[in-house]
Amino acid sequence: MMKGISSVSQSINYNPYIEFNRPQLQISTVNPNPAQSRFSRPRSLRVLSLSADPSANRNPKSAVDAHAPPLVVVGSANADIYVEIERLPKEGETISAKTGQTLAGGKGANQAACGAKLMYPTYFVGRLGEDAHGKLIAEALGDDGCGVHLDYVRSVNNEPTGHAVVMLQSDGQNSIIIVGGANMKAWPEIMSDDDLEIVRNAGIVLLQREIPDSINIQVAKAVKKAGVPVILDVGGMDTPIPNELLDSIDILSPNETELSRLTGMPTETFEQISQAVAKCHKLGVKQVLVKLGSKGSALFIQGEKPIQQSIIPAAQVVDTTGAGDTFTAAFAVAMVEGKSHEECLRFAAAAASLCVQVKGAIPSMPDRKSVLKLLKFSI
């Protein structure tokens, strides 16, 4: 069994109240006032000066007061099996890859890794298999890796860790095939109070669509009731998003392809993107954060003028895997730190620019010092 991660055998019915090991921070670190109810949220977010020099902070893992409500990511964790190829194979064709390796990834794990590497207190709620891929992910995310708190990650012995085949082409673009594994099949029907407690006490929550919609709905409803902002990254399943989920989120974050799929509308021009976003507004989503790849990003707030952000050019594009996750997580970190919308977009753009310059998803996530340095020299 992996260190710091509880094991759940599913040869019998899953018990959502099963005890699990918590060797690290307890939930009390989320609530700076022990006199408050375990489910009450701090009324204010205490953020320290965000020094570009991590050594200037009391906690080398965090640039923010440890009592600040954390970023909580509920989602997927995958082992990304990379194969570098010159081009995609044609139907019936077999081609040779230049190289191959396995790295930790998955949209949820990527976003959690990014939050922690940006030195904001970050918790990950997810499911792994008891296998080599699960161990790889736990080591990449945990104290010896990115510094993500894994108190709410559970492992199961009858489902494999989720994995993905990433076909990386010579121009840095990629195509991905995902096997859900534990991400899709190891969750309980009803989320435990323990798992919901951490999201109720969060400063902000990130969701994606690589885990069951039923889990996202339970989390989003609990978060909405607690008054915690939640961002839903559209990446993952290509099925329609349930209205129950849309009704409980604050920000919907698709890329332009996902926006087109979601609305059934073209998204080739900014005008078309704006029209597609208007359809999302009619579905009840007031804020839509659209990732536009090489064209940058845009935040659409219902009733307001869109806020556009150009890309911050990368010295070289090595691998775009994880760039969208980096952008979303960096935006969330800036948002929970109280930055303006414009500052959030720029901070996220800088993080994404650094991400695409390194191969792999989690290995490419930038640290705060690098992001601040890029922002300083790209004004």
Swiss-Prot record:
Ligand binding (substrate): 78-80, 106-110, 210, 325
Pathway given in the UniProt record: Carbohydrate metabolism; D-ribose degradation; D-ribose 5-phosphate from beta-D-ribopyranose: step 2/2
InterPro entries assigned to the protein according to its UniProt record, in alphabetical order: Carboh/pur_kinase_PfkB_CS, PfkB_dom, Ribo/fructo_kinase, Ribokinase, Ribokinase-like
Cofactor annotation: Mg(2+)
EC number: 2.7.1.15
Active-site residues from the entry: 325 (proton acceptor)
Uppermost EC category: transferase
Cofactor: binding details: Requires a divalent cation, most likely magnesium in vivo, as an electrophilic catalyst to aid phosphoryl group transfer. It is the chelate of the metal and the nucleotide that is the actual substrate.
Disruption of the gene: reported phenotype: Abnormal accumulation of D-ribose. D-ribose hypersensitivity; normal growth except in the presence of D-ribose, which leads to chlorosis and growth inhibition.
Binding residues for K(+): 319, 321, 355, 358, 360, 364
CDD domains cross-referenced by the UniProt entry: ribokinase (cd01174)
Role, per record: Catalyzes the phosphorylation of ribose at O-5 in a reaction requiring ATP and magnesium. The resulting D-ribose-5-phosphate can then be used either for sythesis of nucleotides, histidine, and tryptophan, or as a component of the pentose phosphate pathway. Can also use xylose and fructose as carbohydrate substrates with a low efficiency. Can use GTP, and, to a lower extent, CTP and UTP as alternative phosphoryl donors.
Family to which this protein belongs: Belongs to the carbohydrate kinase PfkB family. Ribokinase subfamily.
Protein name: Ribokinase
Originating species: Arabidopsis thaliana (Mouse-ear cress)
